[in-house]
């Protein structure tokens, strides 16, 4: 029978503002110990598929240093430290990154971004219906974001063709397909 590993010891290997790594000592089965199991520690993430009354998708384009490219994706962001409501985080991120807001939210659920080497980092997916532009963008210090509006059918085709490469963006579009096309 599969059993959870036993945590013996935990310490910070790296504890910086934007990146934290924990070094765990774990017993994976009786007598078998791993001394250096590293976990990247992240806050949960919210991803927002915002749909306008005209059935358009609100996308953002920004440089992603990890990929080394300018990426087109759905609005998203980390939950702030101490923030415990993913819906409130989703509303905040949508407004900050795009200036759009919505009063109609549907939760698609949460998914693990990396269940092997990351702790926390659950990805919460939301559908924001009838999204409207109500404010200016409010960027974080490290953001420069362009907002793009695409018909849902075009965004879905972009996901299928690989033009949209973020797995969370593709997943959200695929989950929304049946809801929005019926």
Question: In which residue ranges do the predicted regions lie?
Answer:
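A short, amphipathic edge element
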Residues: 1-11
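Conserved Nudix-box catalytic region and its N-terminal flanking loop in Nudix hydrolases
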Residues: 2, 47-92, 139-141
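Acidic, metal-coordinating catalytic segment for phosphate/diphosphate chemistry
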Residues: 11-47, 52-53
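Conserved hydrophobic/aromatic beta-strand scaffold that supports enzyme active sites
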Residues: 21-23, 49, 125-127, 147-149
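Active-site segment of metal-dependent pyrophosphate-handling enzymes
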Residues: 43, 51-54, 64, 73, ...
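Nudix hydrolase/Nudix homology domain
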Residues: 2, 70, 124, 141-182
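Short loop segments at secondary-structure junctions
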Residues: 29-31, 52-54, 63, 83, ...
């Amino acid at each position: 029978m599969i059993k959870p590993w036993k945590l013996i010891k935990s310490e910070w290997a790296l504890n910086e503002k934007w990146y934290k790594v924990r070094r765990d000592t774990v017993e994976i089965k009786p007598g078998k110990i791993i001394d250096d199991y590293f976990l990247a520690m992240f806050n949960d993430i919210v991803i927002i598929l915002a749909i306008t009354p005209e059935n358009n998708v609100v996308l953002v384009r920004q440089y992603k240093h990890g990929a080394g490219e300018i990426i087109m994706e759905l609005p998203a962001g980390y939950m702030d430290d101490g923030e415990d409501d993913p819906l409130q985080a989703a509303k905040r991120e949508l407004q900050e990154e795009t200036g759009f807001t919505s009063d109609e939210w549907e939760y698609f659920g949460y998914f693990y971004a990396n269940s092997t080497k990351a702790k926390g980092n659950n990805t919460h997916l939301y559908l924001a219906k009838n999204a409207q532009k109500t404010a200016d963008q409010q960027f974080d210090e490290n953001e420069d974001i362009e907002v793009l509006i695409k018909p849902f059918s075009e965004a879905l085709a972009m996901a299928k063709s690989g033009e949209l490469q973020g797995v969370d963006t593709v997943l959200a579009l695929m989950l929304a397909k049946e809801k929005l096309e019926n």
